[in-house]
From Swiss-Prot:
Protein family: Belongs to the IlvD/Edd family.
Gene source species: Francisella tularensis subsp. novicida (strain U112)
Keywords carried by this UniProt record: 2Fe-2S, Amino-acid biosynthesis, Branched-chain amino acid biosynthesis, Iron, Iron-sulfur, Lyase, Magnesium, Metal-binding
Name of protein: Dihydroxy-acid dehydratase
N6-carboxylysine carried by residues: 127
Biological process annotations from GO: isoleucine biosynthetic process; L-valine biosynthetic process
Assembly: Homodimer.
Pathway(s) the chain acts in: Amino-acid biosynthesis; L-isoleucine biosynthesis; L-isoleucine from 2-oxobutanoate: step 3/4; Amino-acid biosynthesis; L-valine biosynthesis; L-valine from pyruvate: step 3/4
UniProt key word Lyase: yes
Length: 560
């Protein structure tokens, strides 16, 4: 008996009572034969206003052509996106994290309303990646991700530069390290064309995580956006989705607990973004896999950082592509027993089978260190708890900035206040900068603090101050930084009670973050604290404030 591949779409195309549905489909140009083909949603996060996403419609057309060669019907649709790079440092960043859940909601909506049989998602920028994955997990229909790809490095006066060079140029100009003319030249040359920000920032981090999970084709995460190989990846989309339909392999068959462990190992080795903690928690929630922030610490305790990527290192993702790509790194880890090779992937094969014929990394490469010569012996993503963060926080400690910082609090109730203080020279060596009321509800949307960290680095204070926040950090942030502090200030967390001059200890060796205050003093301050007025009174941010969970559970919006 022939297997039914259009088990969802036939509800509309083969049911005589659905004449209006069929009339509209005929009106789109479908013919009698098309009515019996499986329908594949091709969900692109295309929009013109961002290098990460500007080319995705073109990739979507390549995917549609590939799908239709396999006697399937491709149905392209779009969802929304937010450019973190463009909105960074403004109130627009409040819309970034919530766009992740809007992307998941909108893809789920289109797929479910139109009864598509499978989904190929094409994300480009940071929150696109987990948003698409959360939709795939919720729907649990055959599908996978094609990453839009990484940007090539910019070049200025013979040296490679990227988006973080542009962010740091303002602080460098303020401190006299570069001229205004050099700043202008930097921002004009940092982004040479299509593709996501080139270092191990959030988009590339999540692309690596998705490939390690088995939810994208091999090499997807490291293939540059404008390369021939990215077009070839799109050309494989049709046979890949058809194979998934025929074998009835669904996301929940692939996105298992062991697959998430593979993802956590790879992003640690790669020196990935703190945002991966939030996003992997949310992705796991979408498929009912039990994952907690403590699991990230367990992985960090036994996994080294090996990749010398920007922002704290030298290289960008396109450099890795040139020496074998992400699969070459995973093959090294598999040989070392650090990955679960028996995990199923969207190729229909196991991870080990996918990696069997992948070439090893070149012996003399300087991008990925050998296991016996790590950049850091344990993971850079450290989960810190203590009286400042009883529910946890996430520190990004590469080792270059040290592992323990003791200093006095310099407290700001917004990102803007802190930026003004740096401009006025009011941030000093030894400060623990506190930026609060920037959490999931308080921000709202937990905006990223890349502008403050870039100012700190640009001003030459990277080794001399620490920054803690209930907001997030961009993958481009580096320095002694701790984010995702929970409970957040808006909900009366300890970070709301900190005052200028408080002595704070951040210890990434013992995984603690504490303020030197007695329980009596903390209780006294708590009794005087009053919740601030919500920053959003209507619209999408108002809804987000009402539904978003704590950073310690991934900031999801569909929990009970």
């Amino acid at each position: 008996m022939k297997k039914v591949l259009n088990k969802y779409s036939r509800r509309l195309t083969e049911d005589k009572s659905q004449g209006a549905s069929q009339a509209m489909l005929y009106g789109t140009g479908m013919n009698d034969a098309d009515m019996h083909k499986p329908q594949i949603g091709i969900g692109s996060v295309w929009y013109e206003g961002n290098t990460c996403n500007m080319h995705l419609n073109q990739l979507a057309q390549f995917v549609k052509d590939s799908v239709e060669k396999e006697n399937l019907k491709g149905m392209r649709f779009n969802t929304i996106g937010v450019s973190d790079g463009i909105s960074m440092g403004t109130d627009g960043m409040s819309y970034s994290l919530q766009s992740r859940d809007l992307i998941a909601d909108s893809i789920e909506t289109v797929m479910s309303a139109h009864w598509y049989d499978g989904l190929i998602s094409i994300p480009g920028c940071d929150k696109n990646m987990p948003g698409c994955m959360m939709a795939l997990g919720r729907l649990n229909r055959p599908g996978f991700v094609i990453y839009g790809g990484t940007i090539q490095a910019g070049v200025m006066r013979g040296k490679p530069i990227d988006i973080v060079t542009a962010f740091q140029s303002y602080g460098a100009c303020l401190s006299g390290q570069i001229t205004e003319q050099e700043r202008q030249e930097t921002i004009k040359k940092a982004c040479p064309g299509a593709g996501a920000c080139g270092g191990m920032y959030t988009a590339n981090t999540m692309a690596c995580a998705i490939e390690a999970l088995g939810m994208s084709l091999p090499f997807s995460s490291s293939t540059p956006a404008t390369s021939v190989e990215k077009v070839q990846e799109c050309d494989k989309a049709g046979e890949t989705i058809k194979n998934l339909l025929e074998l009835d392999i669904k996301p929940r068959d692939i996105m298992t607990r062991k697959a998430f462990e593979n993802a956590m190992v790879l992003i640690t080795v790669m020196g990935g973004s703190t945002n991966a903690v939030l996003h992997l928690l949310a992705m796991a929630s979408s498929v009912d896999v039990d994952l907690s922030i403590d699991d990230f610490q367990e992985i960090a305790n036994k996994t080294p950082v090996l990749a010398d990527f920007k922002p704290s290192g030298k290289y960008v993702m396109a450099d890795l592509h040139a020496i074998g790509g992400t699969p070459a790194v995973m093959k090294m880890l598999l040989k070392a027993g650090m990955l679960h090779g028996d995990c199923l992937t969207v190729t229909g094969k196991t991870l080990a089978e996918n990696l069997e014929n992948v070439a090893d990394l070149p012996e003399d490469n300087t991008i990925i260190h050998k296991l016996d010569n790590p950049i850091k012996k344990t993971g850079h993503l450290q989960i810190l708890k203590g009286n400042v963060a009883p529910e946890g926080s996430v520190a990004k400690i590469t080792g270059k900035e040290g592992e323990v910082f003791e200093g006095v609090a310099n407290v700001f109730d917004s990102e803007e206040e802190m930026v003004a203080a740096v401009e006025e020279g009011k941030v000093k060596k030894g400060d623990v900068i506190v930026i609060r009321y920037e959490g999931p509800k308080g921000g709202p949307g937990m905006p990223e603090m890349l502008k403050p960290t870039s100012l700190i680095m640009g001003a030459g204070l990277g080794q001399d101050v620490a920054l803690i926040t209930d907001g997030r950090f961009s993958g481009g942030s580096h320095g002694f930084i701790v984010g995702h502090i929970a409970p957040e200030a808006y909900e009366g967390g300890m970070i709301a009670l900190l005052e200028n001059g408080d002595k704070i200890t951040i210890d990434a060796i013992n995984n603690v973050i504490n303020v030197d205050l007695s329980d009596q003093e903390i209780a006294q301050r708590k009794s005087k604290w009053r919740a601030p007025k919500q920053k959003a009174s209507r619209g999408t941010l108002k809804k987000y404030i009402k539904t978003v969970s704590s950073a310690s559970t991934g900031c999801v919006t569909d929990l009970d």
